[in-house]
Amino acid sequence: MSWIERIKSNITPTRKASIPEGVWTKCDSCGQVLYRAELERNLEVCPKCDHHMRMTARNRLHSLLDEGSLVELGSELEPKDELKFRDSKKYKDRLASAQKETGEKDALVVMKGTLYGMPVVAAAFEFAFMGVSMGSVVGARFVRAVEQAQEDNCPLICFSASGGARMQEALMSLMQMAKTSAALAKMQERGLPYISVLTDPTMGGVSASFAMLGDLNIAEPKALIGFAGPRVIEQTVREKLPPRFQRSEFLIEKGAIDMIVRRPEMRLKLASILAKLMNLPAPNPEAPREGVVVPPVPDQEPEA
């Protein structure tokens, strides 16, 4: 037996560790390998470079509202292929694929609940649903959110993210720009606050309508915000655009938005702003996440 064979005979093979899929992920910006559970606890913000990754609509709403207070609105509304549209694929097949992938019926999720005990209505876009395009159901759900805020006499918060209008619905999609803007005008007449939170990316018809109509327009760091994308603009004007063009830091320098807030600080910041606008006590940062719903008590005559 050669010395190599003697060494090989003394080697005990070990079983390769089985790591479940999805335990680790990589930061899109710095490339750091991150533990998935830790990243979720950090609200999808990279602990190394502070890059804000995309967050599902439901996770965003659950991270915002008090535990146990969430009630979904407009879940019965579903998209329909009224035009029988077809490009390289039937629209109804695209819808079925997006619904299966995301578990959502459409790109906007609306819930009412409480934020530090204060009643609010909140909406958030699901990025993975057909590029967060705006169709008729998105418009209908947003209007439902506005109407619920008026009914409850409470603020509305919307986390926008969109690639624009949904071309498969043609004019019915474009009509949602006017429909949502008109609904917000009625809310403004009531004097109820509407805060728009712009996330990456917020483009097209959404940015040209309700995403930029907030009483306060807040953006997450480095979010891409605009109508047409930078590549399209460069090809049109045939000029090189300035650095960070259409990013939230560029927009705040030009006065296009009101403030930039990091995601981990968003919940308390929104609650503090709304408390001032609604003339309510400032939120307690140490308060538990449980929902505290305190309905107004109407003035009543004592029973005889």
Swiss-Prot record:
Catalytic activity field = N(6)-carboxybiotinyl-L-lysyl-[protein] + acetyl-CoA = N(6)-biotinyl-L-lysyl-[protein] + malonyl-CoA
Q: Return the GO cellular component terms, semicolon-separated.
A: acetate CoA-transferase complex
Which Pfam family, just one, is annotated for this protein? Zn_ribbon_ACC
Q: Where is this region: Disordered?
A: 284-304
One Gene Ontology term of the biological-process aspect is: fatty acid biosynthetic process
Q: Where in the cell is it found?
A: Cytoplasm
State the needed cofactors, names only: Zn(2+)
Sites where the protein binds Zn(2+):
C27, C30, C46, C49
Keywords recorded for this protein, A-Z: ATP-binding, Cytoplasm, Fatty acid biosynthesis, Fatty acid metabolism, Lipid biosynthesis, Lipid metabolism, Metal-binding, Nucleotide-binding, Transferase, Zinc, Zinc-finger
How does the cofactor bind to this protein, according to its record?
A: Binds 1 zinc ion per subunit.
List, for all copies, the residue spans of the domain called CoA carboxyltransferase N-terminal. Answer: 23-292
Q: Where is the composition biased (Pro residues)?
A: 295-304
A single GO molecular function, which one?
carboxyl- or carbamoyltransferase activity
Broad class of the protein's primary localization: cytoplasm
Biological role: Component of the acetyl coenzyme A carboxylase (ACC) complex. Biotin carboxylase (BC) catalyzes the carboxylation of biotin on its carrier protein (BCCP) and then the CO(2) group is transferred by the transcarboxylase to acetyl-CoA to form malonyl-CoA.
State the protein's name.
Acetyl-coenzyme A carboxylase carboxyl transferase subunit beta
Instruction: Report the gene name.
Output: accD
